[in-house]
Amino acid sequence: MPLASGLLTGKFNKDSSFAPDDHSNYNINGDAFDVGETFSGVNFNKALEAVDELKNILPEGITLSQLSLKWILMHDAVSIVIPGAKNKDHVSLNTSSSELDNISSLMNEINSVYTKYFFDDVHHRW
């Protein structure tokens, strides 16, 4: 789940809600399901804080989705990411992330956000 069920697209905020029968609502605390499922096993509200920090370092002209996917692709152990997409515009945006070359300078800041919000909760699972 490279975009953490949409969390790393920036489409959710603290006012977002889910239907009672929506699996997102069921796993809003990040403790249900198996590793890597809804919200990648991270508490929804905690992840929103991370998203806010990432938005603050987002370069002009780059979406949060693109930044997130490129960050994954910049790890030596990763050769491909398979994100979800609901339409052809999402596909185009997602594939264009591999062509970004101007985020190397942000890696330390992105890694810091990952460490602060996600590392303890999920890193040991991978």
Give residue spans per PLM region.
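Glycine-rich beta-alpha junction loops
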Residues: 1-12, 71, 87
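Glycine/threonine-rich phosphate-binding loop and adjacent beta-strand/alpha-helix elements that clamp
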Residues: 67
